[in-house]
A protein has these predicted regions:
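Serine-hydrolase catalytic machinery in alpha/beta-hydrolase-like enzymes
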Residues: 2-73
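Gly/Ala-rich beta-loop-alpha elbow adjacent to hydrolase catalytic centers
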Residues: 81-90
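Hydrolases whose catalytic domains are alpha/beta-hydrolase-1, hotdog thioesterase
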Residues: 89-93, 114
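Short, conserved loop/helix-junction motifs that constitute active-site signature segments
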Residues: 97-98, 113-120, 139-142
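A conserved short beta-strand
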Residues: 98-110
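Short beta-strand/loop motif that positions the catalytic acidic residue
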Residues: 124-126
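Conserved loop-alpha-helix segment in the C-terminal half of the alpha/beta-hydrolase fold
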Residues: 133-145
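Catalytic histidine-centered segment of alpha/beta-hydrolase-like enzymes
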Residues: 151-162
Length: 185
């Protein structure tokens, strides 16, 4: 039976998330996948879906609401892949008891404000040009390693090269499936 993988979107949810289909395409043959739209987890219902309005809604209660809903929905230990705000949601839910086998966070910048980490295996990936990525001193303080990809910004997770990297990382970490390479003859 396949391992369960829960994917939690960035703040835009499925609305601007066509890139998420690439992750699903790569990973669905290896995992039993559940997808959560961060806006739906947070019960956001905004008249104007501007970046500022969405961000403020998450910061002022939406993240906490999403954490509570995720805790109610997921009871069995599984793996998580989360993007930006979605990563903050899973990070905080894991600290409150969400059963997490592993957490792969991509561009989760708000966790830089946290002074403690969940007691689960965490992978952190950021773009070097992401203005709000955590500092190395923060990662050192929490005993975490951050992977930083040069020449990428906050939305690196929507780039096909990064999508392939993240999917391969997950496959190697979780399923222990090594990539097949053709030998030169």
């Amino acid at each position: 039976m396949a391992e369960k993988l829960v994917i939690v979107s960035d703040m835009w949810g499925a609305r601007k998330g066509l890139w998420i289909t690439s992750y699903l395409g790569y990973l669905q043959q290896y995992f039993d996948i559940t997808f959560y739209d961060s806006q739906q987890l947070a019960n956001l219902d905004l008249t104007v879906n501007s970046e500022e309005n969405i961000h403020n809604s998450f910061v002022h209660g939406g993240i906490d609401t999403a954490v509570a809903h995720l805790l109610k929905k997921e009871k069995a230990p599984c793996h998580y892949l989360a993007f930006s705000t979605g990563g903050t949601i899973v990070w905080n839910a894991a600290k409150k008891g969400l059963p997490v086998k592993s957490l792969y966070n991509v561009s989760s910048t708000r966790i830089r404000m946290e002074n403690d980490k969940p007691a689960v295996p965490v992978t952190l990936l950021y773009g070097a040009n992401d203005t709000f990525k955590p500092e190395e001193t923060w990662a050192d303080m929490l005993g975490l390693e951050m992977q930083v990809m040069p020449n990428y910004g906050h939305t690196l997770y929507s780039d096909e090269k990064v999508i392939k990297k993240v999917c391969l990382d997950l496959l190697q970490q979780v399923t222990k499936v090594a990539p097949t390479t053709k030998k030169a003859v």
